[in-house]
UniProtKB/Swiss-Prot annotation:
Spans through the membrane: none
Organism: Bacillus subtilis (strain 168)
Superkingdom of origin: Bacteria
Record protein name field: Uncharacterized protein YpmR
A molecular function (GO) term: lysophospholipase activity
Gene (UniProt): ypmR
InterPro entries reported for this sequence: Ester_Hydrolysis_Enzymes (IPR051532), GDSL (IPR001087), SGNH_hydro_sf (IPR036514)
Coiled-coil region: none
Length: 255
C-alpha cells in the first residue's frame, strides 16, 4: 500500500515538473517573439532639401545615413528608404505632396516617417521683406504656419497611425552668410517651438534638435561650400547621428 502511494506521488511530481517546463518554455518563446526586432524596416521621408540631402557629396543626406546605421543592427536584414522630399518645398507644398498616391503608399508602409519643413517658409518671408527686414512678418506668419504644420501631422497620421514620426528641427542657414541678421535666430527658435508643441500631442512623434550644430562661425566646416547654406557630408553625418540616437533610445520597431 505504501509503495503504491509513493508511486502515485512520484508520478504527480514528474507530471507537475513537465507541465512547468512546458509552460516556461512556451512563455519564453512568446516573450522572445514579442521583443523580436523587425527584420525588414521601411523609412518614408518627406519635406524639403534638408531631407532630400542637398549638399551631401554622396547623395545620402541624413536619411540615407540613418538607414545605414539601422542596417548595422544584426537583427535587421533590410532597410527600404522611400524619399519623397523636394528641394524648395514649403509647408503648403508638402500638404499638396501628401495627396500624391505614390507618397501615400510609401507612408502607409513605413515604420518611420522623417521630415523637415519650414525653412523655405522663412526664406519666402525674408525675400519679400529683405529691404526692410523686421521680425513682424515672421511673427504674423506663425499662426498660419502652425495650422499647416498641424495639418501635415494629421494627414500623415490618417495614412499611418503607428509609424514613428521624426521631425528634424530648423537651423539658421544665414549664420554663415548674413550673420548681421541676429533676429533670425529668435525666429527659428520660435518656429521650432511651434513644431515641438504640435509633435508633443502625438505619443509616437518627436523633434530632433539640430540648430546647435550650425549656430557658430566655427561650424562653417559643416556647411556645403557650393551654396554656404545646406549641410555637407560632415553636417549630414552629425544630423544622422542625432536622429539615430533618438531612434535607439526608443528601440527599433518590433515584429
Amino acid at each position: 500500500m505504501k509503495l503504491r502511494i509513493f508511486s502515485i506521488m512520484a508520478s504527480l511530481i514528474l507530471l507537475l515538473t513537465a507541465c512547468t517546463s512546458i509552460r516556461t518554455s512556451s512563455e519564453g518563446k512568446q516573450k522572445a517573439h514579442e521583443t523580436k526586432t523587425k527584420e525588414h524596416i521601411v523609412i518614408a521621408a518627406v519635406g524639403d532639401s534638408l531631407t532630400e540631402g542637398v549638399g551631401d557629396p554622396d547623395g545620402k543626406g541624413y536619411v540615407g545615413k540613418v538607414a545605414d546605421s539601422i542596417r548595422s543592427d544584426k537583427q535587421v536584414k533590410t532597410v527600404d528608404v522611400k524619399n519623397y522630399a523636394v528641394k524648395g518645398n514649403r509647408s503648403d507644398d508638402l500638404l499638396e505632396k501628401l495627396k500624391d498616391k505614390k507618397v501615400q503608399k510609401g507612408i502607409k508602409d513605413a515604420d518611420y516617417v522623417f521630415f523637415t519643413i519650414g525653412g523655405n517658409d522663412l526664406m519666402k518671408i525674408l525675400r519679400q521683406n529683405f529691404l526692410q527686414l523686421t521680425v513682424e512678418p515672421f511673427q504674423e506668419a506663425e499662426k498660419p504656419y502652425e495650422k499647416r504644420f498641424e495639418k501635415i501631422i494629421s494627414e500623415i497620421r490618417e495614412l499611418n497611425d503607428h509609424a514613428e514620426l521624426i521631425y528634424v528641427s530648423m537651423y539658421n542657414p544665414f549664420t554663415f552668410t548674413l550673420s548681421e541678421l541676429n533676429e533670425i535666430n529668435g525666429v527659428v527658435t520660435d518656429w521650432n517651438h511651434i513644431a515641438e508643441k504640435e509633435l508633443k500631442k502625438d505619443k509616437h512623434a518627436k523633434i530632433v534638435h539640430i540648430e546647435d550644430l550650425f549656430n557658430q562661425k566655427s561650424d562653417s566646416s559643416r556647411i556645403s561650400e557650393e551654396d554656404d547654406f545646406h549641410p555637407n557630408g560632415t553636417g549630414y553625418s552629425l544630423i544622422a547621428k542625432r536622429v539615430y540616437q533618438a531612434i535607439k533610445k526608443e528601440g527599433l520597431p518590433k515584429e
